[in-house]
Regions:
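Small/polar-rich, solvent-exposed N-terminal microdomains that initiate assembly or binding
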Residues: 1-62, 87
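Generic detector of short, locally flexible boundary/turn motifs and exposed helical patches
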Residues: 38-46, 66, 94-100, 115-117
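Short connector loops at helix/strand junctions that flank enzyme active sites
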Residues: 50-54, 70-74, 127
């Protein structure tokens, strides 16, 4: 059954428990609370400053399918870093793709829909993102 919040929680847990991503975000020795401040489940925020790095996990509009009782929810993952560290965002997104593509989330596989390339973000920062989809019964 469709349960977007639980699905988003699982994706956040997968990403926030990966040592390579934590290393890229300079969070390898951070507390769970500090990690949760940098790997968030929403697209809107206004508190990036200095050398902050952040991953945002959120839903985009679902796609319809040929079967009226199923839907294809779309999860977007963005990485925001200081502009001079754009290569870190690209490395993070590469790792996210490896972690999530064909990964089972609540008994449903996630599939990479597309890489989004560079996305708008706050001045002085760089953002890269990608989208994943899965099929769920309504």
């Amino acid at each position: 059954m469709l349960d977007p919040n639980t699905d988003k929680d699982v994706v956040q847990e997968i990403i926030s428990s990966d040592s390579e991503i934590l290393n890229l975000l300079d969070l390898e020795s951070a507390s769970n609370l500090e990690i949760a401040k940098h790997i968030i489940k929403r697209s809107r925020w206004d508190d990036l400053a200095g050398n902050d790095k952040r991953i945002s996990i959120y839903f985009r509009p679902s796609r319809s399918t040929r079967n009226e009782i199923t839907v294809a929810p779309v999860i977007q993952v963005d990485c925001h870093v200081p502009a001079k560290q754009d290569y870190i965002a690209e490395k993070v997104m590469k790792r996210v793709k490896i972690l999530l593509h064909k990964r089972m989330v609540n008994n449903r596989p996630l599939y990479l829909e597309s890489s989004l390339g560079e996305l708008p973000t706050m001045p002085g920062f760089y953002c890269a993102g990608c989208r994943f989809y899965y099929y769920s019964i309504i």
